Each structure stands twice: as C-alpha cells, then as structure tokens.
Amino acid sequence: MNKEKKYWMNKDEITVGEPVVGPADLQTTSTEWNRRDFLKTAGFSLAAFMTACSKTPVNKAIPFLIQPEEIIPGKAYWYSSTSHACGSGCGVLVKNRDSRPIKLEGNPDHPASQGGLCPVCQASVIELYDSKRIYNPQIFRQDSTWAALDSFVLKNLNKTRKQGKKIVLLTETITSPSNKFYIKKFLKKYANASHVEYDPISYSAILDAHEVNYGTRFLPQYDFEKADMILSLDADFLGTWLSPTQFTKDYRKNRNLDSKHISKHIQVESRLSVTGAKADERIVKSPAEMLQLVKDIENTLQSNGEHGIATKIAKALKHYKGKSLVISGVNDIGIQILVNRINKSLGNIGKTVLHNNPSFQKGGSDNAVSQLLTDMESGNVGALLIAGVNPVYDLPEGESFGEYMKTIPTKISFSGKQNETAELCNVICPLPHYLESWSDDEFTSGILSMTQPTIQVLGDTRTFRKSIGGWTGYEDGERNLIRNYWKKIYTTRKKGSQSFNRWWDNLVHDGFVMIKPKSVSVGRFKKGQLEKTLAKNGLVLVAYPSLQMLDGRHAENPWLQELPDPISKLTWDNAANLSPKKAKELGVSQSDVIQVKANGKSVELPVYIQEGQSDDVVAVSLGYGRKGTERFKNLGPDWIQKKATLAEGELVGERINHLLERKENILSYSGVSVSISKTGKTADLALTQTYNTLKNPENTAPPSMKVRPFIQETTFEAYKKDPSSGAHRGHQVVTLWKDDHPYEKHHWGMAIDLGACTGCSACVISCQVENNVPVVGKDEVFRRRDMAWMRIDRYYSGEGTDVDVAFQPMLCQHCDNSPCEPVCPVLATVHSSEGLNQQIYNRCVGTRFCANNCPYKVRRFNWFDYAHDDELENMVLNPDVTVRSRGVMEKCSMCIQRIQEAKIEAKAKGIPLADGDIKLACQQSCPADAITFGDLNDPESDISKLVEDPRHYHVLEELNARPTVGYLTMVRNREDENEGGHHG
C-alpha cells in the first residue's frame, strides 16, 4: 500500500502529548459548590472506596421436588431451534441453565447460520424476560380470558360476514407452511376474507421485477460462495440485507488467501454501509445517478459504447461471466429489472442466482397495501386482523392508517408488546416469545426449520397458529397443530425413506431437515419495460435499516440500543448523516439539530458528519422513535446533575417513516427530495469513539513512516508475491534475560483476521450476554463510561467520498508483560499460570491505576451499581460469571468460565484438551470466523500456525507489553499500489 497511507478515527482526534478532556458538560466552569452537591460527591467517593468491603448477600437455592431427567443443576443443556429475531431464519442452539434460556449460539449444521449469529439474534434472548410484555389476552384494553376472547372474536367475525364487509388479515411474510395451511382454512371459512402480506422493510421491487421478467413473483436465492465477481448496488448484504449471516459465511469462503484467486467485490452506494466498508472497491453515487449507472453497465455489456466507470465494471463482470453476481438493495422496480437483465446476459441464472430453490423470507406486496388503504378509506373493511407488523409505525401513511382503523368495528392485534397499532385495537391476542413457542418455517425452499419451546410459557399467551386454527375448528395443542399438518403431507416433501416418527424426531432434535424444494414456475425471460427515473437531482433522503434496530421491532431492547453503530459509533439515537462538504455548505456542525422536510412533513434530527457519503444525500436510519422506548427515561445512574437519559414522555430517536413516499405504489427509501433548515438547537450524541485512544510514539516508527499503523493492509497481488507485504514489523526487543515466566501447561492466545472482520458487532453483543456486561444508558455513554469488554474500532483512510474503512476488534490483549499488573496496589490484576491477565473483583478498590496504565484502553470501571431491580430480567444473567459491583474494574476475561468448563470436562472423560474444544463467546458468534483462539504451547494448534503467519502482527508491539492477542494484515483485492516495505 502507499507508504503515506494513514488510518484515522475522527477528524478531531487528539495528538500525542495533547491532554485528553471530557465532554463539554463535564468540564467545570465554576468553582462554586453548594453544600448538597459536595456531600453527594463526598458520599460517592467514600462508597467507592469502601465497596470492596461489603458482604455478598446470601441467596438460598430451592431444590426440585422431582428433578427432571435432562436437568443437572449447575450444568448447561442445549435445544436446537430457529431464531425469529431478524427474519433470516438462522438455526440456533439455545443454552439453558436450570430451565431458563440464557444464551444463543448459531447452529453449525444449519445452512443459514453455519455456526454464526447476528447481533440482533444474540440480543433477542433478553426480550424473553421483558416484564413489560403483554402476558394476558385483552378485550378493550382489559385483561380477559382466552375463552371470552374467542367468543368475542367469532361473534364479531360472523357479524362482519353477514354485513358483507371485508375481513382483512394483515401480516408480515408468512414463512411457516402450517400457518399458511390454517390461514387458507380461515379464508375458506370466511369467504369475504383476504390475506395481505407486507414487509416492514420492503423488498417488493425485487419480487415485482421478477414477475415482469419471468412471469412469477418470487425472490431468488443468492450464492456468494460461487461468485468470483460481486457487484452490489446499495445492497448491505453483510449488514442487514436479507440473510447477512449466511451471506457473510459464503462470502468469506470465496476469499481464502490460500487459493490462487479470491472474489472481487465492487460496492456502489450513496451512504457508507458495513458492506461498503469491506468492499475491494467502493463507488459513491447518489440515488439520482444509480439508475443511469446500471443502464450504462447494461449498454456496455451489449458493446454499446464507452460509459466511464460503467465500462470498467462491465469488463470485470464479463471477465467472470457465469461466475459473477449482481444484486441491488434499492426498492425501485426499474433498477431491479435491469439487474435481472444483467444477470441473465452474464449467464448467472442457476449458478449464483438460484431460481430452483428460491427464498421465502420476503413476499410482501406494496401494491396490496396501497389497495388496503383505499379499501379502509372507503369504509369497506369491517374487521382487521394484524399479525407481525405495526402499520401505524411502519407505513408512510401510518397516521392515516390509524385514523382509518378507528372506523373499523373489529380490530384484532396479534402482538407480544404494546405498540402504535396494538393500542388502537379492541382485541389483543398476546404472542409468546419465539423461545417459548413452537413453529415450523421454510425461509428457503428445501430447508424446513423447527422452533421449539425452551422454557415454560411465562404468561397466558398463545401463537398466531393456535388462534387462527382454533377459530377455524382446529382445536389442538401448539405442537400437534404443526405435527398433524406435516404428518399429512410429509411424504410429498421428505427426502429418503424414514418413517414419519423418525423424520419428526430428527426435525426437533436437529432443528431442521432438508426437504424437497418447492420450486416456482419460471416462464421465459422477458426484457420488460423500465419505470421512471429513481429520483430528482438535489438533496435527497436515504432511509436505511440500522444494524441494531432493523425496522424498529427491537427498539425496546437495551442491549441493541447501547450497541454502537458500526460506522458512526452512535448509540441511543439516530441522526441526519451529512457529508463534510454538505455540512460545510449548509453551515452546520456535528450535534446541531436540523429540520428535515419532505412532502410537507418534517422531523428534527441531530447532525452527524459522515465520511464517504454522497454530497447529495441525507442518510437517516429507520427503527427509532418507537412507542415503548419511553421506558428508558430513568435508565442509568442517578447522577449529581439529575440528567435523565430521556425527557418525560420522550422516545429514543425519531421516526422518519412519514417522510417516505411511494413511486408506482412501491415504497421508496431512496431519492425523496428534502430540504434542510437550522433550528438553532444542539443535541448530545452518545458516541463511543470520540477520540483516538491508541497512539504510537513517533520515535518508534519505521524510518519511512511518521507512526507505525495499527491497521496494516496490503493487496492480494502484493500478498501473492510476498505474504509479509503490508506488515511493518517492530524492532527486535533487547532484553537482559530470557523469558521470565515459562507457561508449562497452556498459554492461551488469540488472532483476529482484519480481512475477515466485517464490523457487524455480533462479538460485542455475544460478549455482553455471556459476561453479564451492564447497560449504562445514554448519559453515561456520553461521558465515555460504556462498559463493553469488546469494542470495534473503526478507522478511515482518505478524504471526502473516497475513503477506505477498516474495523479492528479491540479487547484486553492479555499481555505477557502487562503494564496494568505492576501498578495495582492491592494485586487485583494478576497474571495466571496460563498467560491470562485476570481481574480479582473482591480485591479491587477502584484506584483505576490499571486503566490509566493500559495502552489499549480496554478496562472498564463500574462507576455505579447498575440497575438489576427487575427480577424477571435478571433471569438472563449467566450464573457462571460474577455480576460486578460499584467501584470495581472489569475487562475481558477471555471467557475463563468456558476455559475451565472445557478443562473439567476433558479431565472427567480422561482425555487431553484438544484444539477447538474451547470456543470463546466472541469467536463462536462471529459470522466471518475472524477470531481464532487456542493454546500457543500446542505447535499443531490453529493459533500457533497463525502466529507464524507472515501476516501476523501485534498492535503497539514496540511498547513491549507482549500481547497474546494478535492481528492478521487486511488484504483487499484491488489493483496493486505502491507497496511500503516492512521494517524488521
């Protein structure tokens, strides 16, 4: 790479030797203290000093009267199931302790998850223990019984049928075959009933485009493993688009550096996404330019002239004909038709674009929703049943939808939570969490996934299937409703000659079975007519699902609210992202509040200045401003300033769905013309990366560089010539003695592949769930007091729209020469006999000397006793990990509880501990398999081999802390640049 290339975190990052100051509101401007504030501060200081002297309360265990056969107290057991948190249908393994689920891991055998899991699925376990869920059936907002509710519903449905008005069942895409069966029976019973599906994040344009081109409305499956050339047009397939976990797994398989070839990835987008950050080449185009670019690519493929950058892309696609893949995340039918044409002309159909086993994840129709709005406005709807969606929040016409609902006599909500739509319904059928219910789902044709209860139902809830089935005469238990359906039809879908009982047992035990794919009828390809251009010129809105909130259904999840956005590092909020050039042009700075107006509607948002974004775009994430987030008003400690996380009645972030518009009835997320005006107000942005915490002293840098970079990278061409290219080695450390501490048994170490890491943050949430890391609230994050043991540092290189991005997971480096250990006055931080830097909580008195002396800034201090008042929510805590108290320092423990468990199990079996027996929480969840952990004393272990890899290096190695966590140089597949040599 270029010798002068430098990665940076923020424009205003501090320089070496410059003092570090806190946020503006923490800088005292007056020396006058009143007596009350002084006593509060003095009291806190004394309490922090004395916290290590307090006794742990005694909690007595109550034994089982009759112990279940499968439960051994204190030992985890696992269930195979399926996640319903993000809609990807990943297979999961549910870890239970004493009859309560506490952790999810990806099922390594399931084709969708392949052992990985996204952060949303990881965090969904806490929603099971949400005390604010709806736990009883309700009629007119009063708790009732299911018998009374069923009687009320049937009476009103029959009344609606006699009146000749429509009964509309409005749902998200139904992926359950048995649910489809019972819905079909419901529609047959009520001849005036219809079923409308829509997806809160619409994919309608892809389905509609396939109907234009192939005569059938369907969503194909995409095979990234077989794609040697990937062109992604605003499709964040490594972040939130369709099946990011599966796509990440497959994407990484075709980027194996041991092979002679790795896939080439070009990303065209208007905002900086997770996928764009990992692309080999990234091209910034506004929504107005996107359609023209795709047209130019198609014309170039047909040898119709030169079209600038489109010609370069077309040549690359043509070079990998039949092994390329073109996708688009733009919900515009014109672009999707062009994408279909290009894939067809390149011969990708049946190779990387699969029609024989399509995806059933998304099947919603925006056209059907538009028709429903018309019917509701005209008063033709007499009963509305809503399941899995929140149209009052989701739709641009949400306010009108709510008004129309008031005129409908019978409104039934199937929801586990109170939301904007449920509160307008006169009947609420509370749904159980997916971890306490049965379900069958075919997210992808040919893969039948099973969801099974992993805990006794916590309330008087029942599934959508149970309600609809019961109202059509199918009275049975949840399990039998599914089992009886498959018993009738399994012979038409099963593979092999198994009996039904054996087939069913395998389905429940494994969490999935492979069945005969349900193909779609694909007609001859038709070119189709293009729709109008995507957008007008000028400033436009780009609305996108954030990696944390998606469509907003998880807005009440505190773990996801406090999870930093992978790119902006913003928590507890959404913002108006503007390019530096546009912000300067508008005269606004970061944290200024602006008014964004579109189609006569407006919203006020704080400004976030985002590198790598189109100058013609204001990008805002969806999923915020959701009802239910007012619960976080008092989240966080009662600090001296009495500053609440939220104002009274305030929601987290702002809803922007009302700014969207429909084009040809299809919901458009890109290209809505907007205007911006200043409000004169500012807002606090709770960012987790507000200055550069890692600094390399200039005098330790190689002669050719000002500082040695902690992000080291190279190109694939340079790597093939010299595997050590891009690695800037430190000087040989001069020492007066040999290794002063031999590790006789195990010496644990870790390596993280920067080329694999996508920044998805699955590891961050997995670590938080596994290790009982507390949520501190927006105010404390703003004060730089977040508690995450694992953080993902995001670095930029370049200026304006032409920036490269790198992600670097940063955790305790477990140094063999740890700077934190000798400064602790009470030996609370010590070195284990196996090379781990350990924190002894009951010794710690909170001097924070260790945090001050840590060059990696990975230690976290408990400034307060963070709330654990909700007894139901406390059920999610891992009993193997101590819940830390105020005044105690904490950090990554390298999942010592998992290490000890594996060692004990191996000893009990009388076998040696094998490489791979121990999987750390972050490692196990990573969809990209970027993290490797093992024993450095075992020369045959994967970690030992990676340490000898020429790509391996340590961050700040010149400080001689001798970390056991190393990194592998990032490799991009792009044209070779002037490669800087390494320094040995």
Language model feature labels by segment:
Residues M1-S303, I428, P564, T571-N577, ...:
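N-terminal export/assembly segments and adjacent metallocofactor-ligating motifs
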Residues D25-T29, V457-S519, D592, D779:
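N-terminal leader/propeptide and maturation segments of large enzyme subunits in energy/redox metabolism
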Residues L149-I167, K189, Q221-M229, I309-S324, ...:
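Glycine-rich phosphate/diphosphate-binding loops that line cofactor/substrate pockets in enzymes
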Residues T240-H261, P396-I412, I447-M450:
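A short, gly/pro- and small-residue-rich
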Residues K321-K323, S328-I386, V392, L547:
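Acidic catalytic cores of enzymes that act on phosphate-bearing nucleotides/polynucleotides
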Residues G379, Y393-E436, K581, L586:
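Hydrophobic alpha/beta core scaffold segments
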Residues E436-Q456:
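Glycine/threonine-rich phosphate-binding loop and adjacent beta-strand/alpha-helix elements that clamp
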Residues K488-S568:
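Long, low-complexity segments enriched in small/aliphatic residues
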